[in-house]
Amino acid sequence: MGGQEYAISHWPDTEEILAKLDRLVKLPMRPIKRQQMANYLEHFETACNQSKQLNEEARKYIPGGVQHNLAFNYPFPIAVSKAQGPYLWDVDGNRYIDFLQAGGPTLLGNNYPAVQEKVSELVRECAPVTGLFHEYELKLAKLINSHMPSVELFRMLGSGTESVMAAIRAARTFTDKARIVKVGGAYHGWSDQMVYGLHIPGTGAMEAFGIPSGCLKGTDEVFPNDIDSPKGLRALLEKNQKKGGTAAVIVEPLGPESGTRPVTRDYNRRVREACDEFDALLIFDEVVTGFRVGLGGAQGYFSVKPDLTVFGKCVAGGYPAAGGLGGRRDIMACLSAGLETGKPRAYVGGTLSATPLSCAAGYYSILEIEKTKAYIKAGRAGDRVSNGLQGIIKRYGLPYVAFNHGSICHLETSGAMLLDIMAPNALAEAGPRKQMMEEMGAAFTAEGIITLAGSRLYTSMADTDEVIDAALQGFDRVFRNIENA
């Protein structure tokens, strides 16, 4: 780990967690009691009426009534009016503990004053965007390199999706190979080539509506933690080698969906070894883990050096246009900007890439993360949340599963995203389990806790013991009203 500190205080027993998750999906569901769920839904009607009215009007002008997947709340989206520290407030004046954290970027807490002041100052003096070079592009690139030596060159982009697109294009340009291998269930944005094996391993192109099949011809999928089986990573790389080879393997280093399906402690090392054996590049998608796991990222924690690293979220500290790609100098040279000709160049662009605003926000956010050791504080908060949830689950004899990797916490109650797609009853169970997951998320919200889909929680430096204790009391009120087995 190179002497750096990291948010993950201990690596959880992956085999034990996977066994518990497997047991969860095999057992009958344990949803909230119907009368209590009706009470929660009534709460939304009375306490969140302005949010409901806004959403009803928004549906006339916005597809589905919201612009962001994270906002698809049941029974309707909550309209936020204010964010500060560990809290969110809605338009009805209700306060919530924010464990969504905008999907992970606000490690310092919402609207962190020191960063806000620097960004506001820059916008007043310069502009949010100019289309020309600004010194913060250099400052941010140097700062990232100082913490992640594998990032010899860094290119700021507009989002995690764009950054994955750039990584794939650079890998193919550099290697002159076509095939990309991803892990089933992992999320790497919504570009044509990555809408494959989403959420649940083995689903392939099931969600690839509107994407021509030819776009996915170069994308392969392997199951998480499977290196050496006849259908594992090594076998796939060997098969591809006979047909021109593999350009790159892309992984979320904690496991698919930010560790929802956790990988073993040595998984990334073994993937690195397989890539080296079959001459494929290794891409770490650190959109979530970058700076949240520690200043050295997941690559520093695991002591595994990727060839390319994808950034997002924390790289702009919760401000817009958060994306980036970094890595080996020779590979990144394929992304050189400008009008240079005479050598293969992977084309990328973006009007709002590397704006003064996003680069300054990223630079000062990372400085504050370094100064405050926000990743350690958020990691301790994550430990406290996870341990507390485990205690509540045990107290009420529930089959639910809670675990964490530092400040990235998982709470599986329905197992909706853990189904085996090949199981005979998978499709029949998917709908009811998804409904239960949505109901759990609604119950948590009614108790003043915002989560990601009722199953993932991001903690921040702002989450004090007092905040976490209040949240655990809310979870306790939900879990004491669960249907009997």
Describe each region flagged by the PLM.
Residues 2-485:
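Conserved N-terminal phosphate-binding loop of PLP-dependent enzymes in the Aspartate aminotransferase
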